[in-house]
């Protein structure tokens, strides 16, 4: 097996193997030459994992990162962790599971314990939302009584598939007829067409701003002849290009004020503790009705980090921290002549 061969640099300095198990598309976007080079310069070699082969036949790994799903893969990870308890697996499948359901995903935000007094008048929460399990419930006025149009309809399951990204912006009740449960109906809150994407990598936090769906005017909501709903795939994708372009001609993304850094960091740290995850991002908007209130609208596991500025350095630092997490990290290199130089 691979572990029986000397690792690069044997006899000079210890090298660490970082195994990654990713879908082909994810691997193509995340494992960039710049990341591989940066990690190698720190003594860490990124090695692809073949999920069709038993993990004990591969490696030996000092850290395992992954974004694969299924019972067979989960069984592989459980067996690996039982055999190598000192080797970090980022992240545990049971912790990731919570993000696959859009209700449990945001419920954790409501349960966070963040000392808001330290941030003066800034507050955060989630939009009002309900889960709909069958089509009959869409005509239940009682179920929808707590919500105000417009609404965003999202699939209940958020598993990274194309289907889970298909969403609709619903302007009035007529638009509900096209929806296919199970799904989550979430109030669309005007937010100036700007979304804040907060990337979390261990203790590191980076916040960037992106264009989002344009605000919905009261005229649109009152226009009975207008389309009842519009479909789109991501919050940053525009359902109506002409209207959106007119909207963005009147606003500049660079003028949008970023949330306070300490405020963002505290929310990120609280989410990291509550979720038990190292790699995730969350999307946040500023409520246009109250400029000091922010709403978390989505949380994603192992997002597209290549879009994050300086991601190579951030991820390399994270890998280094994880392989040195325990001072007693075992030397998994079977070569007895290997020197443990850190």
UniProtKB/Swiss-Prot annotation:
The keyword GTP-binding does not apply. Coiled coil: none annotated. It holds the Pfam family Ins134_P3_kin. ATP binds at residues 102, 154, 186-197, 212. Induction: By drought stress. Keywords: ATP-binding, Kinase, Magnesium, Metal-binding, Nucleotide-binding, Transferase. Mg(2+) 2 binds at residues 298, 300. Monomer. Kinase that can phosphorylate various inositol polyphosphate such as Ins(3,4,5,6)P4 or Ins(1,3,4)P3 and participates in phytic acid biosynthesis in developing seeds. Phytic acid is the primary storage form of phosphorus in cereal grains and other plant seeds. Belongs to the ITPK1 family. This is Inositol-tetrakisphosphate 1-kinase 5. The lineage of its organism: Eukaryota, Viridiplantae, Streptophyta, Embryophyta, Tracheophyta. The gene is ITPK5.
């Amino acid at each position: 097996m691979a572990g029986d061969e000397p690792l690069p640099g044997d006899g000079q300095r210890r090298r660490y193997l970082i195994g990654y198990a990713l879908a082909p598309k994810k691997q193509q976007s995340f494992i960039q030459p710049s990341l591989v080079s940066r990690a190698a310069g720190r003594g860490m070699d990124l090695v692809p994992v073949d999920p069709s082969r038993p993990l004990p036949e591969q490696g030996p790994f000092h850290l395992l990162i992954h974004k694969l799903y299924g019972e067979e893969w989960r069984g592989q990870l459980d067996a690996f962790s039982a055999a190598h308890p000192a080797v970090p697996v980022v992240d545990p499948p049971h912790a990731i599971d919570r993000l696959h359901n859009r209700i449990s995903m945001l419920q954790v935000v409501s349960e966070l314990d963040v000392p808001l007094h330290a941030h003066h008048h800034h507050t955060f929460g989630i939009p009002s939302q309900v889960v709909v399990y069958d089509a009959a419930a869409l005509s239940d006025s009682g179920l929808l009584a707590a919500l105000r149009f417009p609404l965003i309809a999202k699939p209940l399951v958020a598993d990274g598939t194309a289907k889970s990204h298909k969403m609709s912006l619903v302007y009035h009740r007529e638009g509900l007829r096209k929806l296919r449960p199970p799904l989550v109906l979430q109030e669309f809150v005007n937010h100036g067409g700007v979304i804040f994407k907060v990337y979390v990598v261990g203790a590191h936090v980076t916040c960037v701003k992106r264009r989002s769906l344009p605000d919905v005017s009261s005229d649109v909501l009152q226009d009975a002849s207008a389309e009842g709903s519009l479909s789109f795939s991501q919050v940053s994708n525009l359902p109506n290009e002409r209207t959106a372009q007119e909207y963005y001609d009147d606003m500049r993304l660079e003028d949008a004020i970023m949330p306070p850094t300490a405020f963002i960091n505290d929310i990120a740290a609280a989410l990291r503790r509550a979720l038990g995850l190292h790699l995730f991002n969350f999307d946040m908007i500023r409520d246009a009705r109250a400029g000091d209130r922010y709403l978390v609208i989505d949380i994603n596991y192992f997002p597209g980090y290549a879009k994050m500025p300086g991601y190579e350095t951030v991820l390399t630092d994270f890998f280094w921290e994880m392989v040195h997490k325990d001072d007693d990290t075992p030397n998994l290199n079977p070569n007895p002549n290997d020197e443990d130089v850190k």
